[in-house]
């Protein structure tokens, strides 16, 4: 299976590094290219043991999956450059936010199978939650192959293209929202008199430990919370204080704003 990556930004790097580390593919079957900075691309490709090239015809020849990882505003120029080199074997996987399947196909002047994926930065540690939507002509075998590729850097959830906006908000932007919550937790902790570095290190380990509890347990998060909440205890007192605030409404506002912005960005390709 030959894979080609157009674009070598942070997200693209996380994805193809995860795929390489999974040992499911021969690195010799992976090809990288970017818009410029050949020296950096050469060094990175050699570090990973993969190929690099700026020859679009050679890249696309016999390529099974072509990842489109350029910045959205650079895509039209890329499409204009490669559209005459596209072959029937090429299936496209876009990680470009906001660009619809129809728009990408129109710019590439092709009806080849195309999938849109929305990973998050946790792909860098093999734990992305990636939303995916397939064009109607993406066959079952090809879907299985793509899902296997994505599982190399996390988990996958298949949704309709319209629902990628919600996935973008909940999991795509989710790490940043959680980081923000943890930031506030650190600030609040320092107000209790402990040193900031003590609080930050404690909360880092708290997050890691809690994540492992969630991962290893079959219980819901609600039940896990109840299991450590004693009536009349300190945890109950803190939860009672939290219950004075409508946290659901706060997160609904947060997620709705992200969904609306995703929709706005997608409308720019009309």
Where are these regions (language model features)?
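Internal alpha-helical scaffold of NAD(P)-dependent oxidoreductase catalytic cores
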Residues: 103-113, 129-166, 179-216, 261
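Short acidic capping loops at alpha-helix termini that bridge into adjacent secondary structure
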Residues: 26-30, 88-90, 112, 197-198
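Short acidic-hydrophobic, aromatic-tinged amphipathic segments that line or gate anion-handling sites
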Residues: 51-58, 157-159
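NAD(P)-dependent Rossmann-like dehydrogenase/reductase catalytic/cofactor-binding core
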Residues: 204, 208-270
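Small-residue helix-packing motif on alpha-helices
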Residues: 30, 59, 195-202, 224
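NAD(P)+-binding Rossmann beta1-loop-alpha1 motif at the extreme N-terminus of oxidoreductases
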Residues: 1-54, 127-128, 190-191
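Rossmann-like NAD(P)(H) cofactor-binding subdomain of soluble oxidoreductases
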Residues: 37, 47-48, 56-132
């Amino acid at each position: 299976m030959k894979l080609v990556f157009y674009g070598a930004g942070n997200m693209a790097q996380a994805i193809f590094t995860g795929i390489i580390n999974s040992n499911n593919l021969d690195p010799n079957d992976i090809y990288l290219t970017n818009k410029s900075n050949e020296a950096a691309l050469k060094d990175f490709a050699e570090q990973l043991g993969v190929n690099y090239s700026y020859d679009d015809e050679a890249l696309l020849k016999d390529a099974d999956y072509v990842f489109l990882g350029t910045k959205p505003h650079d895509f039209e120029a890329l499409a204009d450059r490669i559209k005459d080199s596209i072959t029937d074997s090429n299936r496209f996987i876009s990680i470009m936010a906001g660009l619809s399947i129809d728009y990408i196909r129109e710019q590439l002047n092709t009806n080849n199978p195309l999938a849109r994926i929305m990973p998050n930065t946790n792909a860098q540690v093999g734990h992305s939650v990636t939303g995916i939507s397939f064009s109607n002509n993406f066959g079952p075998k090809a879907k299985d192959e793509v899902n296997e590729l994505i599982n190399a850097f996390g988990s996958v959830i298949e949704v309709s293209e319209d629902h990628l906006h919600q996935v973008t908000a909940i999991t795509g932007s989710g790490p940043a929202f959680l980081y923000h919550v943890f930031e506030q937790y650190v600030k609040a902790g320092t107000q209790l008199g402990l040193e900031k570095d003590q609080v930050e290190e404690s909360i880092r380990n708290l997050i890691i430990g809690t994540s492992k509890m969630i991962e290893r347990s079959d219980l819901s998060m609600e039940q896990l919370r109840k299991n450590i909440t004693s009536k009349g205890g300190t945890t109950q007192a803190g939860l009672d204080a939290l219950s004075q605030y409508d946290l659901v409404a706060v997160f609904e506002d947060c997620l709705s704003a992200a969904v609306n912005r995703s929709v706005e960005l997608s409308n720019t390709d009309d």
